[in-house]
Amino acid sequence: MCMVSVIVPVYQVEAYLPRCLDSILAQTYDDFELILVNDGTKDNSAAVMEAYAQRDPRIRLIHKENGGLSSARNAGLDIARGRYIAFVDSDDYIEPTLLADTVHAAESTGADQVLFNYCLEDEAGVHEPYLHFDDEVIDLDDMGLDRYFYRYWMPYKHGQEAWSKLYRRGIIEQYGLRYAPNAEIFAEDTLFSAMYLLHTHRIAALSKAYVHYVQRGDSLMAMKKPRLARRLMTLSVRLCEYAKAVGREKEIRSVLPVLCYDKLICKGIRFDPSLDDVYAAMRDMAGNATMQQLLRQLMGVMPLVQYTLHTGKGIRTQVRARLFAWRWLHGDVRGAAALVDGREDRA
């Protein structure tokens, strides 16, 4: 058994992969295994993987048919042997002390999760650290999950990406956590991170930027996002169902409806390339019992009062959210969508 399993999904990254792998193999901490998952790549990435594996015994290879990013990460999790799990995207690269610093933080504080910063890198060069937070250890049992979501997740002070954290594999395996299929939900990182949070007692936050998040014009995040509204609504439903299944729903009742509305559902409606798809998704989801419950909770007083207190948004935002939920529940999907779409010129 090693201390860390580093999982790298690989697909169409021939030009970026050597820099990524070099940065991992150059870590000042060497008690790790590197799991490279070939997700059916069609370029020369598989040959690059094989060449590196011949040079370093810490590298383990998986070759599989293309199944998407979630499928590749799950394949890596299935064979991981480390006490901790770290994900690195194959077009990014990392600082030499990432593993040393995060393992030390986890071991010295007893944190279930170590969260760290990153910087964007594009044609203009490397930018400043993207997120703004302090080094700290957060005891979620003292703070409360609802306050953590409002204080750190809602304003995006702490990232939700898979590759900005060190996880305990024991928690992942104990609760059977895996990434949902990309075809079914958007922002699979968000769902996994939220589910993991429900089993987290302590977080160690490191403000240093350890990951160089490389911006590519042909990356998954840069492409158009078909069925975005439906996939984010599905994410919302699954998060609510999971919180209920593990007995944490009551603890986050004041934040969960607002989180799903403000950060997921509204985002899906605003940025889905097809309003027809938005309306169809809303009609289909209107019959979902979990979505109905979420919308009724959104109309309640407490979630929206907490929303205003923590975000500084005024009474108009509360009224809009309640009206959105009321219209959707009563079948007026066009009227509900119009409240949050914000673009008059959409066809």
Placement of each model-derived feature along the sequence:
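Short, well-formed alpha-helical segments that are part of the catalytic scaffolds
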Residues: 12-26
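Donor-binding/catalytic cores of nucleotide-activated saccharide
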Residues: 69, 90-204, 211-227
